[in-house]
Amino acid sequence: ILSTKLKKNFKAMSILSLTFHTPANLVASWDEYIETDLENMVENLMDVEKYILSEVESDMISEGKNTNLLLLFDDVEKRQDFLEIEFKNITERIKAKFGQDVMIFETSLNPKKNRF
C-alpha cells in the first residue's frame, strides 16, 4: 500500500511527452546526436524527476524514425518552467543541427489515475 505522501506525489506529478520525427535520410545522424548530445542534455535537466528515452515502434511510421522522451516532473509548474526555458533550448539546438527536418511534437499529460 502506498503511503499518503506518495499518493499525493503521484497525483501532483506532471508528465511531458516529446516525440521527435526524423526522416529516413537523417536517421544515422539523429542516432548519433541522441548518443552524443540529447542524452547529456536530458541527464543535466534540473527539474526532471525521471525520464524515459525510447525508440517508437509503430505500424503507422513508414518513413523515418520516431524517438520519444517522456519526462516526469513533480508538478505542473516545473513542467511549465521546463517548456518555457529548457524545451526552447533543446529545440534551438536541434534546429541548429537539423533545420526543420526533425519535427518535435510536445504533449502534456495530466495523470487522472495511475498505478506505479
Q: Can you say where each PLM-predicted feature lies in the sequence?
A:
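Short amphipathic alpha-helical segments
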Residues: L26-L53, N89-E92
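Short, well-ordered beta-strand segments in beta-rich or mixed alpha/beta enzyme
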Residues: S14-H21, S54-E86
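An amphipathic, aromatic/His-enriched active-site/gating alpha helix that lines ligand/cofactor pockets
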Residues: N44-E49, L72-E106
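Glycine-rich beta-strand-turn "strand-cap" elements at beta-sheet edges
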Residues: L6, F10, K50-K65, E92-F116
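Residues that cap or initiate secondary-structure elements
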Residues: A24-L26, D75-E77, K113
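Short, surface-exposed loop and linker segments with low hydrophobicity and enrichment for Pro/Ser/Thr
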Residues: L6-M13, V42-L45
